[in-house]
Amino acid sequence: MTTSTLTIPAADVPNTPGGGPSCRADHTHIAAALGAYTQSRSGFAVLPGPARHALLEIGDRLAGLRDALGPAESASGRDPGPHRTSESLVAPVLHDAVYPQLDMLGREIGFAAPATWRAASRYFHDRFGALVDLSPVAARCFHKPLGYAGDFEMMNMIYRNESLGDTLFGRSLSRVLLDSQAGQAVRHRAHYLAGKITAAAAHGTPHRPARILSVAAGPAMELQLILRHDPALLRAGRAELTLLDQDAGALRHARERIEALAAQAGAAMTLRCTNTSIRKVIAEGLTGPYDLIYSAGLFDYLKDRTARAAGARLVAALAPGGTAVIGNFGTANPSRPMLELILDWPLHHRSASDLRRLFGDFGTGMTIEQEATGINLFAAISA
């Protein structure tokens, strides 16, 4: 009996399981993908049944609208004028398609379970993230390229109020987010704070200017508004302004914009920038005294204990008769489910009674104020 042997060149040997480094690398990637899938599914499984249905319904409605708009957009061309008109037609339809389901999610999950919202948001973006990313506004919120929510460029997007996106669906989703009551509240609070700054500057003189500090300043849009529309008090040298932020990029951006606007307005003003964190402020305090200290959105991210410690430092740095203004989104924010699920932008919402509990014993007195929508509250504390 004759036995023949067939020799196969090494290059022709199939890459069978366990057969080499590339296969092991493939196994590693596959295992990671399966682990992510399992984690995502387990997060979905903890949701109440109606919440699971609402989440999937939101994704399905977004996908359906995106698919329906594609052919219509191709037929309409790329002229900006029709685009603006088209967004005004599409955005209300998109809003009405998803907001009832978002409201249902809010009722089913509640807001005492942040881990459940994180699980829901993770699953939603695993399934439907490609749709959400068609809106640059939503994409920046969710992906957080600077490592945290509400960075200065994100706030600029809200302040500029432009429907960004390469597709009609993406621009319409941006419009829905920007027109949300939370988006409106952010823009209104800039005007509210501009009023506080103007009032403080009115009591300053060139010899003793009002000293004003913005904590977590971001783009400092409230100062930009004053310089664009009512620069007279700043032109007279009645205010010294200090911007404090943990993000050096935010401070550079704010300084460039404010100095350019001040030059256009002929405003003689002193502007200082301090690059530090709220942790350091809590640990070391602030170098005062200031006639007005305000923080627009920082306290939305602070737990109660940290918020109270930070508030104490702000009030301690006030001059006699000065005011500290602490902003916080109120619990009656109808945009909260959208923030939690689609944008992964959780905040510590607080009621007026919550603010009184945290800061009511500071200074000589406190009032609770609000911007025009009534969604963003402010604790105004007198020294």
Question: Positions of the model-derived regions?
Answer:
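A short glycine-rich, Lys/Arg-flanked "PGG" loop and its adjoining helix->strand segment in the class I
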Residues: 308-323
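Conserved Class I S-adenosyl-L-methionine-dependent methyltransferase catalytic core
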Residues: 92-204
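Conserved S-adenosyl-L-methionine
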Residues: 213-216
